[in-house]
Amino acid sequence: MGKQVLDSGWLAARSTELELTGVQLTTTRPPSGTSAPWIEAVVPGTVLGTLLKNKLVPDPFYGLNNEGILDIYDSGREYYTFWFFKSFECKLSENQHVSLNFRAINYSAEVYLNGHKEILPKGMFRRHSIDITDILHPDGKNMLAVLVHPPDHPGQIPPEGGQGGDHEIGKDVATQYVEGWDWMAPIRDRNTGIWDEVSLYTSGPVKIADVHLVSSFFDMFRRAYLHSTVELENKSSWRAECSLTILVTTELDGDFNLIEYHQTHELSIPPESVIQYTLPPLFFYKPNLWWPNGMGKQSLYNVEITIAVKGFGDSDSWNNKFGFRQIESAIDEATGGRLFKVNGQRVFIRGGNWILSDGLLRLSKKRYMTDIKFHADMNFNMIRCWGGGLAERPEFYHYCDIYGLLVWQEFWITGDCDGRGIPVSNPNGPLDHALFLHCARDTIKLLRNHASLALWVGGNEQIPPEDINSALKNDLKLHPFFKHNGVTVIGEDMLSETEDPSQYLDGTRVYIQGSMWEGFANGKGDFTDGPYEIQNPEDFFKDDFYSYGFNPEVGSVGVPVAATIRATMPPEGWQIPLFKRLSDGFIEEVPNPIWEYHKYISYSKPGKVHDQIVLYGQPTNLDDFCEKAQLVNYVQYRALLEGWTSRMWTKYTGVLIWKTQNPWTGLRGQFYDHLHDQTAGFYGCRCAAEPVHVQLNLATYFIEVVNTTHEELSDVAIEVSVWDLDGTCPYYKVIENVLVSPKKVLPITELKYQGSKNAKPVYFVLLKLFRPSNTTILSRNFYWLRLPGTDFKLLEPYRAIEAPLKLTSEVNIVGSAYKIQMRVQNLSKNLNSESVNFLANDEKSDLSKKEGYISRICSGFKNSGTDSLRVVETKGTGSGVAFFLHFSVHAVKKDENEIEDLRILPVHYSDNYFSLVPGETTNISISFEVPHGVTPRVSLRGWNCSEEHYSVL
């Protein structure tokens, strides 16, 4: 009883190279191995992924390789129509039943098993289940062949590219990004393949399917009920007398499970029938609630439902993680933006747009875990699954449940491909509306039990055709328990008189018809999202930057580190852009053809934004360019989020950045690259999106404290220090007795250093929010700033001042997993003297407090005295701020002549791209896994710190 996943041992062959039928393949003429035309197949995966695995095509994401791969429009659909073959063993006992399940195929298929044929209907986002009980061979040895056809309308890629190519893919119920976008090259096979899980499922005479779990709350979330409806299919020819048991447990520390509920109900199911059975609601008093990232724990219960049949025993079981939580959404009266509440608490949305993890649909659990943890590490609380991408997989949602990411899931409509593109096409959406609705309803059943799923949206920058939109509104209408704005409209005493909410398809989440409607952008569907290019950092704080309460898309630059450029492009792609100075003084960047193909966008906007990279000096080579790009990435995205947060609840209810990552080796709009290395923008977001945060408003130069939590922030103080390039501190102030109400932004005081007569053209500002009672730092924020009309070119000679650093590490190794606690100290001496000129006399009195505060705040790391401690001091002899330090992890070279990319990825850092003032210490946690036989080393580099290699063994 249970599931057997078929994810290995598959073979594939192009249909035009094989003259055998499916009946022959699964009876008398099966393939004997990887002799032509058969090759090893990638399942789950795509045809292009299979061809790449067998080196029959070059890596489409490397350089310009994609241009050398035949496009489906030019080759014809038959070229990417493939057979997939697998033999498997499955032997049944009496009264057992088995189904063959495909969780998704793109786009249609013919299935042959032991000579029997089954035609699978079209649609990329639907499950297929075939009862194969009577088809299996008695000896348990079986042969399976699947002929997979591409989408019916794969479309043509115009020479100039475009948003969704010629839009033909919009006629099918399929992912649309595959025709290419302004951030994506086209996918040549249009993601044809068995792209999701294939499995065998064995049960007894009665099978469980499509369980629906819902929680309802009363009495300010102290009283809760778990509602559940189960679909039960009796596959036997006799009436089944059954016992249905539900078991609810919660995990305690030490891998112990606490049983919360264990109930059994008796029922009878007619022969060869399917019934819906609703269990009585289970009552919970003060259950552990599931909260979004940054608001509390992601408490999850385990729900197991088992069906036993009289005379047979256990027939089937189902289990799933479940989070008690309630999501509300309405248009906020104060801002006009869409407002979300979880468990009665307002959530200020800071998150990002998501396309999909990989353009060849290599969607492993490990990759999903890294992707979602990265979003949580950035302190984000929402991911928007864009309508031109996927209905994301259960594994994606599992990790969103674990890490607390709310998910906005769109259906497969985009303005570009469905009525608003240039040229206009498919104004009535996909050709088969019934198919679209079938896929939508099946997707809802697949995903609805996930606590992280927050809302359904009809499409991207477009609404579905009227009949589809009306059907979705009806299918997703809210149950009366959830039609409220903070107050439950039905009392607990009405539970027995109201239709159980688990009987709805999904009545717990709002349905919004499109991404720019009903509280998003201007709410009317006009193109009022964006912008998507480089900005002056201070502009994000200005009142006229964005006019509406919730921006679903605002984006900018995203060049990765130089090592990624070298790993994903040939040497001719390592040439940095040409910087062409225009007559008005602005700079136009001209990228090389490979960068242009990989959708690079400029770090300048002639006429509005001066080149943000050249502000640091003309880059000389790829390493210099990418290092300066990281400076800009950090500043750009920190300013974006801090600008939005500065007007939390007064003007804005949320923002989603376009976009957090790329499904290929693109060069725009990303916080980590396709290889899973973070940009500095990642850590700019992590800083800005802290639940409790201190920040500098770059438009007003007021220091602000942000409290997004539902608790008052009291007994806190702010330390403000300004540092010159020579390591002196001309400005220091401590502001005590700060109190910030829940969910408020409080301006504290204006930073006036930049207006003083002795202000330096380039200077550093360090803000610390801390508790004086125990010197716990709640938020730390480091800025590098310039006076108006100047640039950052004074930082260029600063590189020659080698900052002296001390690194202390403690290493923990379990199998292939490494966890390193790294303490980094700037050994520079504090050069302050009593002759330092302050702006006002009242600030001079704070000087005597400075050393005490700094030494206490920076003393958090204690030497444990264990053998795993290592200490290294760099050779720097200069003095001043250790600027823009960043760790990386590499494999130790086995040969000094090795030049390939030796980075170990992914790596999770508690912080990176950080700076330390003289005498300051910080602690960084680093975790990663190493491949077998690889010895890792940690590298620390910085603007004024040359690379140091640090072996962890």
From Swiss-Prot:
Protein's name according to its UniProt entry: Mannosylglycoprotein endo-beta-mannosidase
UniProt record similarity statement: Belongs to the glycosyl hydrolase 2 family.
Assembly and binders: Heterotrimer of 31 kDa, 28 kDa and 42 kDa subunits.
Catalysed transformations (reactions): Hydrolysis of the alpha-D-mannosyl-(1->6)-beta-D-mannosyl-(1->4)-N-acetyl-beta-D-glucosaminyl-(1->4)-N-acetyl-beta-D-glucosaminyl sequence of glycoprotein to alpha-D-mannosyl-(1->6)-D-mannose and N-acetyl-beta-D-glucosaminyl-(1->4)-N-acetyl-beta-D-glucosaminyl sequences
Active-site residues, Swiss-Prot/TrEMBL: 461, 553
Sorted UniProt keywords: Glycosidase, Hydrolase
Tissues in which the protein is found: Ubiquitously expressed.
Catalytic EC class: hydrolase
A GO MF label: mannosylglycoprotein endo-beta-mannosidase activity
GO biological process per UniProt: carbohydrate metabolic process
Pfam families xrefs: Glyco_hydro_2, Glyco_hydro_2_C, Glyco_hydro_2_N2, Ig_GlcNase
InterPro entries: Beta-gal/glucu_dom_sf (IPR036156), Beta-mannosidase-like_N2 (IPR054593), EBDG/EBM (IPR043534), Galactose-bd-like_sf (IPR008979), Glyco_hydro_2_AS (IPR023232), Glyco_hydro_2_cat (IPR006103), Glyco_hydro_2_Ig-like (IPR006102), Glycoside_hydrolase_SF (IPR017853)
Role, per record: Glycosidase that specifically hydrolyzes the Man-beta-1,4-GlcNAc linkage in the trimannosyl core structure of N-glycans. Does not hydrolyzes pyridylamino derivatives sugar chains containing Man-alpha-1,3-Man-beta or Xylose-beta-1,2-Man-beta.
Enzyme Commission number(s) from the entry: 3.2.1.152
Modification note: The mature enzyme is proteotically cleaved into 3 subunits of 31 kDa, 28 kDa and 42 kDa.
